[in-house]
């Protein structure tokens, strides 16, 4: 359902061409959970952006749910994301002028869902915020904000969820609770999960671990999960 074919990403810098990713290839099956690990600067977030069609590779291509993302213009890639992809980021990316329920309703309304409010309330309840749905992001704790972000990501029942350091701004206890919630929702929905993390214990909960170093894929290993 997700394939990376010899992905390379290069950018110009004052010192010349900078290689961020070099010839990265792998595939991810439907429903699989995959962690992407590596030191800072290894290219993890760049890889995630390419896999989601938020950026295009210098060479190579990504197939997502049967679509070659490099063959599509930005509108075409946006349509694929709207139909197939959910995102959870370290910094939450909630709309500050919308309350929790409205933030979750937003992708449902954009997708033309018949009853966005009812669907959003249902998943808000699932993530444990039944009594906080009317609160705005500024009124929520970090853990609550991430619960809203997770609810928003799963609301449209995406084929694949991309999570970039989703516990990076949370304390260890809150982060553990958030990841337990994310893995539970992932199991229940059979969504494919691609997770960028520095947390080895979190990576071990995934089916596979992809390790990047200096832009190259140096390991692709199955876990005991």
Please describe what each predicted stretch is.
Residues 2-214:
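ABC family nucleotide-binding domain
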Residues 216-225:
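Conserved beta-strand-loop-alpha-helix hinge in the C-terminal portion
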């Amino acid at each position: 359902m997700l394939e990376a074919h010899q992905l390379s990403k290069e950018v110009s810098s004052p010192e010349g061409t900078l290689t961020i990713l070099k010839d990265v290839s792998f595939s991810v099956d439907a429903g699989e959970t995959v962690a992407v690990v590596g030191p800072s600067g290894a290219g993890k977030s760049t890889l995630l952006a390419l896999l989601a069609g938020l950026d295009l590779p210098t060479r190579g291509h990504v197939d997502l749910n049967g679509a070659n993302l490099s063959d599509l213009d930005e509108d075409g890639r946006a349509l694929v994301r709207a139909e197939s992809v959910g995102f959870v980021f370290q910094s939450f990316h909630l709309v500050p002028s919308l309350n929790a329920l409205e933030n979750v309703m937003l992708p449902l309304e954009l997708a033309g869902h018949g009853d966005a409010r009812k669907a959003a309330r249902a998943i808000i309840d699932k993530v444990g915020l039944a009594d906080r749905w009317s609160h705005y992001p500024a009124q929520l704790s970090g853990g609550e904000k991430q619960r809203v972000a997770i609810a928003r990501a799963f609301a449209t029942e995406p084929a694949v969820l991309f999570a970039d350091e989703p516990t990076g701004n949370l304390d260890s206890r809150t982060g553990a609770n958030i990841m337990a919630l994310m893995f539970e929702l992932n199991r229940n929905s059979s969504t494919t999960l691609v997770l960028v993390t520095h947390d080895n214990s979190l990576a071990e909960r995934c089916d596979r671990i992809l390790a990047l170093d200096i832009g190259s894929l140096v390991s692709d290993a199955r876990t005991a999960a």
